[in-house]
Amino acid sequence: YLMPDFNDPIFLDYQEKLVTELGKRYNGNPNIAYVDIGNMGTWGEGHTYTSGVMYSQDTAKRCIDMYADNFPDTHLFVINLTQHYAQLEDYCIERGIGWRNDSFWVSSPQLYTYQSQYDKYWKTNPINMEAQHWERLQGWNEDETLAAFSDIHPSYFGLQWYIGNLMDGYRSFVERAAKRVGYRFLPETVSITNKTRAHGYIELN
């Protein structure tokens, strides 16, 4: 893979111009659930796996700022940038940016939570969790995987595989996993003080 010099000021200036225009057009768009800060590293995933040449912390911070400044009304996720520069974790949290891992369990079950990052983010900021390609992980311990969901508290979760094949073989797991993602409010009791006639209507606010 060919990769740019991510620290090059000309490269960064043009990136910032692009992100600024994207923000003008798409910030706050109700059809966009979130935007990844994915302009750095191999495949936009923050790491430099294919070259081994890392960008600087100042460059990483500038990339975070250009998105946070131009998408103030859209959920943002940072991908692996803070894995390399832990000092930026608190900065991202302060700016309301969520954390996305691409991908969990890609190396080994022992790395399935990236616990330090998730622990810092999930209580105040959203988590976006993506799994290793499913065909490489058949034979997962489903209960252990669901336990990871409880630890990580994801608001979004992506399984990388053809949905038909996945649902044919693992529908029960997918349905159980879906119940661990996001938030569900289940009222135990409801008290209604308004009165109405039989078959009438009560307005709830």
Label each residue range with its predicted role:
Residues 158-186:
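Extended substrate-binding grooves/exosites of carbohydrate-active enzymes
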Residues 6-7, 32, 154, 187-189:
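A broad structural signal for short, well-ordered beta-strand segments within beta-sheet-rich domains
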Residues 2, 156-158, 201-205:
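Ordered hydrophobic segments in well-structured contexts
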